[in-house]
Every structure is written in C-alpha cells, then in structure tokens.
C-alpha cells in the first residue's frame, strides 16, 4: 500500500494536494517527504496501523488523525491556499475545510522538522507485519 502512495506521487502530472504536502515538507523540514516519509514506520505512507515506532512516525499518526477529522472535502486531492510570512507558513483561503487540510499538513511538516533527530533508517520500509499492536485512539 505504501508503495502505491509513493508511485502516485512520483507519476508525472500528479495533481491534488499530496504534491502540496511534499512542497510544505521541503520548505519547513528541508527534506523530501516522499523519500523520507513515504514508507516509514507504521504510519508514514498509505494506511497506518499499530503503534508509532518513534517521534517521526508519531508525526504521521497525528497527521492521519488530523485528516480523519476533516469533513466536507478530500484531504488527499483538494488544493488549499497558503503563503509564507516571515518564514512561517500561513494557511488561508475562504474554504474552512481546505484550510483545515493545510493546517494538518503544516503541523506535520513542523513535526518532521522538530523530530529529524529521531529519524531512524531501520524504520524506512518497515514491514507492516511489525505493526500489529493495537492502535491507540486519535
């Protein structure tokens, strides 16, 4: 499943908000979301189950929970509006639902930046069979 997400993002002409998320991660965390988080731990990438393996994986868990609370638009496809002001990402636009998506993505990008030191290559392409513990609630 995670591989499908990576492939979807890497295809030429990809549209929708996943590319915006990648851009935010690059701007805020200074690294590629697709490369570093496209298939990391139990929650980064498509799907998610079990318990987060470290703080970086927890960023993805919280992001998944945030998306789960968005109603009225599609977090994986809809474009949102944001700007940069004094080095900070500011979510904008008239659509409150799309603004929520932006806030979810912004918070995840900040989380990735703040937890770079927890990133552990042993969780890159982590086997789903190691993510069988009961998930905690959002």
From Swiss-Prot:
| Disulphide-bridged cysteine pairs | 42-131, 44-60, 59-111, 65-138, 66-104, 73-97, 91-102
Pfam families per the UniProt record, alphabetical = Phospholip_A2_1
- Tissue range of expression? Expressed by the venom gland.
Q: Which UniProt keywords apply?
A: Calcium, Disulfide bond, Hemostasis impairing toxin, Hydrolase, Lipid degradation, Lipid metabolism, Metal-binding, Platelet aggregation inhibiting toxin, Secreted, Signal, Toxin
List localization entries: Secreted
UniProt catalytic activity: a 1,2-diacyl-sn-glycero-3-phosphocholine + H2O = a 1-acyl-sn-glycero-3-phosphocholine + a fatty acid + H(+)
Annotated cofactor note: Binds 1 Ca(2+) ion.
Which InterPro entries would you find in this protein's record?
Answer: PLipase_A2, PLipase_A2_Asp_AS, PLipase_A2_dom, PLipase_A2_dom_sf, PLipase_A2_His_AS
Annotated EC: 3.1.1.4
Q: Name one GO molecular function term.
A: calcium-dependent phospholipase A2 activity
Q: Which residues form the signal peptide?
A: 1-16
Per the entry, which co-factors are needed? Answer: Ca(2+)
Binding-site list for Ca(2+): 43, 45, 47, 64
Using the UniProt record, give the first listed, main subcellular location.
secreted
| GO cellular component assignments | extracellular region
Question: Biological process (GO) annotations?
Answer: arachidonate secretion; lipid catabolic process; negative regulation of T cell proliferation; phospholipid metabolic process
Main enzyme class:
hydrolase
Function comment: Snake venom phospholipase A2 (PLA2) that shows a moderate inhibition of ADP-induced human platelet aggregation when tested on platelet rich plasma. Exhibits high hydrolytic activities and prefers the anionic micelles (dPPC with deoxycholate) to the zwitterionic micelles (dPPC with Triton X-100). PLA2 catalyzes the calcium-dependent hydrolysis of the 2-acyl groups in 3-sn-phosphoglycerides.
Q: What protein family does this chain belong to?
A: Belongs to the phospholipase A2 family. Group II subfamily. D49 sub-subfamily.
State what protein this is by name.
Acidic phospholipase A2 Ts-A1
UniProt organism field: Trimeresurus stejnegeri
**Organism lineage:** Eukaryota, Metazoa, Chordata, Craniata, Vertebrata
């Amino acid at each position: 499943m995670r591989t499908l997400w990576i492939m979807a993002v890497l295809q030429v002409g990809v549209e929708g908000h996943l590319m915006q998320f990648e851009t935010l991660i690059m701007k805020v965390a200074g690294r590629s979301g697709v490369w570093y988080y496209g298939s990391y731990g139990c929650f980064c990438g498509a799907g998610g189950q079990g318990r987060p393996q470290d703080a970086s994986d927890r960023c993805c868990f919280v992001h998944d929970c945030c998306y789960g609370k968005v109603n009225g638009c599609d977090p994986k496809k809809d474009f949102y509006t944001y700007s940069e002001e004094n080095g900070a990402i500011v979510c904008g636009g008239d659509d409150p639902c799309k603004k929520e998506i932006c806030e979810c993505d912004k918070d995840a990008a900040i989380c990735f930046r703040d937890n770079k030191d927890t990133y552990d290559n042993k969780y890159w392409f982590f086997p789903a069979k190691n993510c069988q513990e009961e998930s905690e609630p959002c």
